[in-house]
Swiss-Prot record:
Pathway: Polyol metabolism; myo-inositol degradation into D-glucuronate; D-glucuronate from myo-inositol: step 1/1
Cofactor: how bound: Binds 2 iron ions per subunit.
UniProt-annotated binding residues for Fe cation 1: 98, 123-124, 253
Cofactor(s) needed by this chain: Fe cation
EC number from the UniProt entry: 1.13.99.1
Native species: Pongo abelii
Gene Ontology biological process: inositol catabolic process
Highest taxon of the lineage: Eukaryota
GO cellular component: cytoplasm
Family: Belongs to the myo-inositol oxygenase family.
Pfam families: MIOX
Stated name of the protein: Inositol oxygenase
Localization in the cell: Cytoplasm
Taxonomic placement: Eukaryota, Metazoa, Chordata, Craniata, Vertebrata
Length: 285
């Protein structure tokens, strides 16, 4: 069965990326008008309307039992091939190839950090949420903290939050909202999507990866933080120490997509070895 999740807005619409970084890379997010931008706006409008404290807590309760599926990491990678990116009708290759492309980009730049290579393979596996019936706005796109007022660098911030009930609630509508200053992102309730879900899967199944890996997975779509420099009032010193790692990962997530597809069959044994080392066996999803 093919499930359409549409374009991941985090990858196709980046109004906040430094133009200098974008030179010769414009084709990765060259969407500034037309029907795709309309679709991305609609995704964010739905997300910014429905992602509330109550909604996110309900999703943690719904998926926190990890009873939806039993499978290995490599089986989850293969499941990504059932997700169709409807924004690319002329590009016919499996979504799992992006996982291997990202991992191989990291492997080339950081040959001595095998755990980092594995993060590249793992980072989008939370998108299997779409196969469990979740709508696109609860799977993909930039993430942000719920329970406090959205900050300026949140995509479409000025035009998509008007119908979010939390912004009418005095507990959640200030800069700090329900949080204490510099409480740490580990105490922040993030909007629900593939980042948060995969982070929770990793914790539940006790992946033996370093803290940097957990940060990369949980916050790689948190562009208002790692690119927009917002939400500093919530950050601990630990968060700031981890920020460069998240930023380093982001370079490979955005810019490793290319028409030169990796030979997945040749790569599988290497990555299976990493899976066996850090997250072996049949996992609970």
């Amino acid at each position: 069965m093919k499930v359409t999740v549409g374009p991941d807005p985090s990858l196709v619409y980046r109004p906040d990326v430094d133009p200098e970084m974008a030179k010769d890379k414009a084709s990765f997010r060259n969407y500034t008008s037309g029907p795709l931008l309309d679709r991305v706006f609609t995704t964010y409008k739905l997300m910014h309307t429905h992602q509330t404290v109550d909604f996110v807590r309900s999703k943690h309760a719904q998926f926190g039992g990890f009873s939806y599926k039993k499978m290995t990491v490599m089986e989850a990678v293969d499941l990504l091939d059932g997700l169709v990116d409807e924004s690319d009708p002329d590009v016919d290759f499996p979504n799992s190839f992006h996982a291997f492309q990202t991992a191989e980009g990291i492997r080339k730049a950081h040959p001595d950090k095998d755990w980092f290579h594995l993060v590249g393979l793992l980072h989008d596996l939370g998108k299997v949420l779409a196969l469990f019936g979740e709508p696109q706005w609860a799977v993909v796109g930039d993430t942000f903290p719920v329970g406090c007022r959205p900050q300026a660098s949140v995509v479409f911030c000025d035009s998509t939050f008007q119908d979010n009930p939390d912004l009418q609630d005095p507990r959640y509508s200030t800069e700090l909202g329900m949080y204490q200053p510099h409480c740490g992102l580990d105490r922040v309730l993030m909007s629900w999507g593939h980042d948060e879900y995969m982070y929770q899967v990793m914790k539940f199944n006790k992946f033996s990866l370093p803290p940097e890996a957990f940060y990369m997975i949980r916050f790689h779509s948190f562009y208002p933080w790692h690119t927009g420099s917002d939400y500093q009032q919530l950050c601990s010193q630990q968060d700031l120490a981890m920020l460069p790692w998240v930023q380093e990962f982001n370079k490979f997530d955005l810019y490793t997509k290319c028409p030169d597809l990796p030979d997945v069959d040749k790569l599988r044994p290497y990555y299976q070895g990493l899976i066996d080392k850090y997250c072996p066996g049949i996992l609970s999803w």
